[in-house]
């Protein structure tokens, strides 16, 4: 499990910028949340994955977006060797922090804080796109592909 500091967003549409702040802080990059909200062009419906990737790179943390297809790809994500930003319920961003000692998946949610879920619940909420700094080891290449520019939700 990865020690990602849970940060709660001030507004519900700030989830993308807040998830990015959590990931940046995990990598010891300190940026004010209000600055990230502004840089991500956060609007009434939030920001896009493209905005998160652009702003993350501006602060020295290039991200790659991966589209995960296939039922078992959720395991590649939750057992990854680093935390990642998950597209969640097709409308939200959260951080996957790995697995705890009881086998539950640890999520840092900008709206609800840190909580633990079963793998099956994560699989039902995960919208098949995750952003990582670099490429995790042991990713199953046949069911996971890098998305360069176009996100499925944009």
Language-model segments: residues:
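Short beta->alpha connector loops
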Residues: 69-70, 89-91, 112-113
């Amino acid at each position: 499990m990865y020690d990602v500091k849970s940060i709660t967003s001030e507004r519900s549409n700030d989830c993308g910028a807040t998830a990015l702040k959590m990931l940046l802080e995990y990598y010891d990059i300190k940026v004010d949340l209000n600055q990230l909200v502004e840089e991500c062009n956060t609007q009434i419906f939030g920001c896009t994955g493209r905005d998160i990737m652009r702003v993350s790179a501006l602060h020295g943390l290039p991200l790659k977006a991966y589209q995960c297809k296939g039922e078992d790809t959720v395991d590649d994500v939750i057992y990854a060797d680093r935390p990642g930003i998950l597209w969640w319920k097709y409308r939200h961003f959260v951080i996957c922090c790995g697995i705890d000692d009881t086998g539950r998946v640890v999520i840092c949610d900008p709206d609800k804080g840190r909580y633990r879920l079963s793998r099956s619940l994560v699989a039902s909420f995960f919208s098949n796109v995750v952003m990582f700094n670099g490429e995790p080891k042991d990713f199953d290449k046949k069911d996971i592909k890098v998305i360069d520019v176009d996100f499925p939700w944009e």
